[in-house]
Swiss-Prot record:
Function text: Provides the precursors necessary for DNA synthesis. Catalyzes the biosynthesis of deoxyribonucleotides from the corresponding ribonucleotides. When coexpressed in E.coli with nrdF2 the 2 proteins complement a temperature-sensitive E.coli mutant, however coexpression with nrdF1 does not complement.
Species this protein is from: Mycobacterium tuberculosis (strain ATCC 25618 / H37Rv)
Tagged with keyword Glycoprotein: no
Binding locations of substrate: 172, 188-189, 217, 397-401, 599-603
Protein name: Ribonucleoside-diphosphate reductase subunit alpha
InterPro entries per the UniProt record, alphabetical: NrdE_NrdA_C (IPR013346), RNR_1b_NrdE (IPR026459), RNR_lg_C (IPR000788), RNR_lsu_N (IPR013509), RNR_N (IPR013554), RNR_R1-su_N (IPR008926), Rrm1 (IPR039718)
């Protein structure tokens, strides 16, 4: 007998104080009142809390399947193929029930309507017809903890505490899929290389289909593809260039989505010195011919230092045939340092080249970003100088924060692998900075997060794309992110981008890095192994640690010194770093990559955080949510008494945002999704100035450009949801 739908006791999910009665205001109307000032000109925060309360009473409780007890519920969910039996079989039933009790005892409440709405719309387990709810937030947290802890009861308990107390939030694919029988992979996104042959192109399209089906966004490197008009088998003017491959990929992504749950999403990256660069960029023009227009793929451009230097001198910039470069140097174009070899390639008559004006190239970039928000930018030399791993980073991902080394695969004629290369998958999750600063044990919070993300890597086996599986097995790479920086700073009455704000960002990321490395070192010691290639890394040589052992890192402002002291968080000393360096050189670290800061989307609403580490876009954010229409979301910790600290990103301006990201970047081995915000008075010159400022400040990548302009609302595109946390 299936269970009946009866309202669960209100206390298990909403507020226990509800007495019922006619005439209640609809939750949607209550939420809308957040956007209206009251008679005294105050923001009505209480209306949003009431909306969350009424959402449970009017909707959630009435549509939640009722069970008499936990045993009945667990038995039903396993029997009916809702839960993965294998996950629960790793524990005694008694432990699972105790863990559920532990979660429910926390008396979790969604502080905002949008948080509750997002959770029930997008994450919770529903009946197969999609009409009724089978889980509360606590149940989802417990299933995620049980899945990631893989039988380790102590870790499962710690994970429940970290997630339900809001300190650690796994990325959408992990939080959505863990423990469910019908599910996608827990991985956020993937990066593939495409080499200059039909086998690699064909295999890449198949890989894109396979990965998109499993729920990840996929970014592909097209830099190595020979340009339009290049020879094929020595016959001139034969190659079609990169555009037809982009068209094939666009169709593949629209076909393959994760059980209809998320639109397939793809990105393609091309080097600035590829001869097809203008054709590539033109695909995003509003007036582009339909034959070449690319509507749903995201574009990224890889720019080396030399391009900026040429523009500074107002010189021409040469574009080099990847086909010729590979013939001359014996390695694919993407694996060459263009900055290093630029003049050598200019002088080499064997390499075909064309020239464009360097400043015109940057002007074109800015025009396009005005029109479409694209392309993303990866500063190639900055990225590779900061890379502690042996090898070259050639491109980034759908949200421009993953920066890992990849190697090419070689194929036989039948498309089987002659040599499996190394491609990239991103195992993501983020810390809420405010809650982490409030943690009873800061070091433990970081360690539990690192262990959770390592579990995502350990449990992922994507056999349909051997290069992704190989990369994951070799590297155990993860990306610990951060969110709620602006929320935390405002709570502590610090302005975003101020000296104190930048000082805090620097010391916080510095301290997180220390504990993340220490946790990875511990895992390496426990397991008696490290990531493949560790001995060729800057961790093994000790070079990575020099900047931490050679100078003192401490707060420059009294305010930040006090924040860490009041929180009881010890800031690592040079001696701490020396000891860690010794242990790492002796035993290694388990994870090749540890940190990456993604553009947290849905999970920051559930977790009640400001997104990533950029400023808020408005004090009360307006979102369009499916059938319900407009929904309003208040910035975390905002009250009518501290509004001055909630200046929005457009008012703050790009310099303070870049300065803040630069402070964090120096302690993050991968990238940070950095969106630039401009007022509608901005010109393409302003965009170029911001790009140059970011490059000079050591920023690794730039994500979207957003203009405060009604016509451009929505340039963020659904695309990044798959990599957004």
């Amino acid at each position: 007998m299936p269970p009946t739908v009866i309202a669960e006791p209100v206390a298990s999910g909403a507020h226990a104080s509800y007495s019922g009665g006619p005439g209640e205001t609809d939750y949607h109307a209550l939420n809308a009142m957040l956007n209206l000032y009251d008679a005294d000109g105050k923001i009505q925060f209480d209306k949003d809390r009431e909306a969350a309360h009424q959402y449970f009473l009017q909707h959630v409780n009435q549509n939640t399947v009722f069970f008499h007890n936990q045993d009945e519920k667990l038995d039903y969910l396993i029997r009916e193929n809702y839960y993965e039996r294998e996950v629960l079989d790793q524990y005694s039933r008694n432990f699972v029930k105790t863990l559920l009790d532990r979660a429910y005892a926390k008396k979790f409440r969604f502080p905002t309507f949008l948080g509750a709405f997002k959770y029930y719309t997008s994450y919770t387990l529903k009946t197969f017809d999609g009409k009724r709810y089978l889980e509360r937030f606590e149940d989802r947290v417990v299933m995620v903890a049980l899945t990631l802890a893989a039988g380790d009861t102590a870790l499962a308990e710690l994970l429940v505490d970290e997630i339900i107390d809001g300190r650690f939030q796994p990325a959408t694919p992990t939080f959505l899929n863990s423990g469910k029988k019908q599910r996608g992979e827990p991985v956020s996104c993937f990066l593939l290389r495409v080499e200059d042959n039909m086998e690699s192109i064909g295999r890449s399209i198949n890989s894109a289909l396979q990965l998109s089906k499993r729920g990840g966004g996929v970014a592909l490197l097209l830099t190595n593809i020979r340009e339009h008009g290049a020879p094929i088998k020595n016959i001139e003017n034969q190659s079609s260039g990169v555009i037809p491959i982009m068209k094939l990929l666009e169709d593949a992504f629209s076909y393959a989505n994760q059980l209809g749950a998320r639109q397939g999403a793809g990105a393609v990256y091309l080097h600035a010195h590829h001869p097809d660069i203008y054709r590539f960029l033109d695909t995003k023009r509003e007036n582009a011919d339909e034959k070449i227009r690319i509507k749903t793929l995201s574009l990224g451009v890889v720019i080396p230092d030399i391009t900026f230097e040429l523009a500074k001198r107002n010189d021409d910039m040469y574009l080099f045939s990847p086909y010729d470069v590979e013939r001359v140097y014996g390695v694919p174009f993407a694996d060459i340092s263009v900055t290093e070899k630029y003049y050598e390639m200019v002088d080499d008559a064997r390499i075909r080249k064309t020239k464009i004006k360097a400043r015109e190239f940057f002007q074109t970039l800015a025009e396009l970003q005005f029109e479409s928000g694209y392309p993303y930018i990866m500063f190639e030399d900055t990225v590779n100088r900061a890379n502690p791993i042996d090898g070259k980073i050639t491109h980034s991902n759908l949200c421009s924060e993953i920066l890992q080394v990849s190697t090419p695969s070689l194929f036989n004629e039948d498309l089987s692998y002659a040599k499996v290369g190394k491609d990239i998958s991103c195992n993501l999750g983020s810390l809420n900075i405010a809650k982490t600063m409030d943690s009873p044990d800061f070091a433990q919070t970081i360690e539990v997060a690192i262990r959770a993300l390592t579990a995502v890597s350990d449990q992922t086996h994507i056999k349909s794309v051997p290069s992704i599986e190989q990369g994951n097995n070799d590297s155990h790479a993860i990306g610990l992110g951060q969110m709620n920086l602006h929320g935390y700073l405002a709570r502590e009455r610090i302005f975003y981008g101020s000296d104190e704000g930048i000082d805090f960002t620097n010391i916080y990321f510095y301290t997180v890095l220390y504990h993340a490395l220490r946790a990875s070192n511990r895992i390496a010691i426990e397991r008696g192994t490290h990531f493949k290639g560790f001995e060729r890394s800057k961790y093994a040589s000790g070079e990575f640690f020099d900047k931490y052992t050679d100078q003192i890192w401490e707060p420059k402002t009294q305010k930040v010194r006090q924040l860490f002291a009041d929180a009881g968080i010890r800031i690592p000393t040079q001696d701490d770093w020396r000891r860690l360096k010794e242990s790492v050189q002796a035993h290694g670290i388990y994870n090749q990559n540890l940190q990456a800061v993604p553009p947290t989307g849905s999970i920051s609403y559930i977790n009640h955080s400001t997104s990533s580490i950029h400023p808020i876009v408005s004090k009360v954010e307006i979102r369009k949510e499916g059938k319900i229409g407009r929904v309003y979301y208040p910035a975390p910790y905002m009250t009518n008494d501290n509004l001055e600290y909630y200046e929005d990103a457009y008012e703050i301006g790009y310099e303070k945002i870049i300065d803040t990201y630069a402070a964090a970047t120096q302690h993050v081995d991968q990238g940070l999704s950095l969106t630039l915000f401009f007022k509608d008075t901005a010109t393409t010159r302003d965009v170029n100035k911001a790009q140059i400022y970011a490059w000079r400040k050591g920023i690794k990548t730039l994500y979207y450009i957003r203009l405060r302009q009604m016509a451009l609302e929505g340039t963020e595109v659904e695309g990044c949801v798959s990599c957004m946390l």
